[in-house]
Regions:
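Surface-exposed extracellular loop regions of Gram-negative outer-membrane beta-barrel proteins
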Residues: 78-93, 116-177, 269-275
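Extended hydrophobic-aromatic, low-complexity segments
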Residues: 137-141, 157-159, 195-197, 284-287, ...
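Repeat-solenoid scaffold signature
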Residues: 162-194, 263-287
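Outer-membrane beta-barrel proteins
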Residues: 60-74, 130-138, 143-145, 153-155, ...
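Surface-exposed, low-complexity loop segments enriched in small/polar and acidic residues
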Residues: 1-122, 162-163, 189-266, 291-310
Length: 310
């Protein structure tokens, strides 16, 4: 202050206008002036750009005329082979206000919006085939096999970091139609989901998370008898000496650190599907499909919610 209790700017070269945040008008409202409000306020601008380049090709063929067919079917093997090259780029630019947690510290916007620059390149080869086994027989109008395979080679770059990984995916299935109205199908597949640029290269950032006791998601490690065990709370950095002596947060808010991981590889899902399609001839334009799915995901890509991080 200026020695008389009035706020002053330590450095006024940037157009600083002082504001006493504790000063109130007679009606209890803040006594901030228009000039001071204009100085501390700002408009955060974030711009983004995405770009995708895809190049590929396929060759299809029917090998019935070459004699590659089942003796009990009226058609033979058909299939395709192909390749694809794909490049995905993403860029995000943030101004100075957006890159600061809470804007200028008083806007209450939470964590900072950090710039991102990254790209993912993938080269793939794939093949698919379909093979009728039996057609036009009693109780077997059509029985056939389908299968496919894809090899993917990924290269990622962003924020001066790079990584590479590959993945194999495939599927195999069988379909049986005893007549025109019913078809049963079974399929086994392995699929992947590769990490995107955000998963890989978003910067480490500290934001806010609500863990208010009001909604039942309070700090499980606070209070004299914490809900979480000492071992669980140790995962958050709480020492044994601190366990049972942490006061609940009066604000109900906590810092949460998030960020990408440039070492991520593709998550993998194994899927088993069994289904039936019913197309009753007595009801025109009606088709009913019933399917059962069993999906198991390994190396899943995601974040751990604050409520379950113990």
């Amino acid at each position: 202050d200026d020695g008389n209790g009035n706020p002053v700017c330590r450095d006024s070269s940037g157009g600083c206008v002082p504001w006493n945040i504790f000063e109130r008008n007679a009606d209890g409202t803040t006594a901030v002036t228009d000039e001071a409000a204009a100085f501390i306020a700002g408009v955060g601008i974030v711009t983004g750009e995405t770009e995708q380049t895809v190049f590929g090709g396929t060759i299809e063929g029917d090998f019935t005329n070459m004699g590659i067919q089942s003796p009990m079917a009226d058609a033979g093997l058909s299939g395709l082979i192909g390749f694809e090259m794909r490049e995905d780029k993403l860029g995000r630019l943030a101004d100075d206000i957006s890159k600061i947690s809470g804007g200028r510290g008083l806007t209450g916007t939470g964590g900072a919006t950090l710039p991102i620059a990254g790209e993912i390149e993938v080269e793939e080869i794939f093949m698919e085939m379909s093979m009728p086994l039996i057609t036009g027989k009693p109780m077997i109008q059509e029985l056939g096999l389908t299968a496919g395979y894809r090899y993917s080679d990924y290269t990622t770059n962003g924020n001066g970091l790079s990584n590479s990984f590959d993945a194999d995916t495939y599927f195999a299935g069988i379909s049986w139609a005893p007549n025109d109205e019913v078809r049963f199908r079974f399929n086994q597949a392995v699929a992947i989901r590769a990490p995107n640029v955000f998963d890989l290269y978003v910067g480490i950032n500290t934001g806010l998370v609500e863990l208010s006791p009001v909604n039942g998601d309070g700090d499980q490690c606070s209070g004299p008898t914490p809900v979480a065990t000492q071992a669980q709370c140790a995962n958050t950095g709480l020492s044994a000496a601190q366990y049972g002596s942490v006061d609940p947060s009066a604000a109900g808010q906590f810092n949460l650190i998030t960020g990408g991981n440039p070492n991520l590889v593709a998550e993998e899902g194994e899927t088993t599907t069994f289904g039936v399609v019913i197309t009753p001839s007595m009801i025109e334009n009606l088709s009913v499909s019933i399917d059962y799915f069993d999906i198991e995901v390994t190396d899943a890509i995601g974040s751990v919610p604050a409520q379950t991080s113990y």
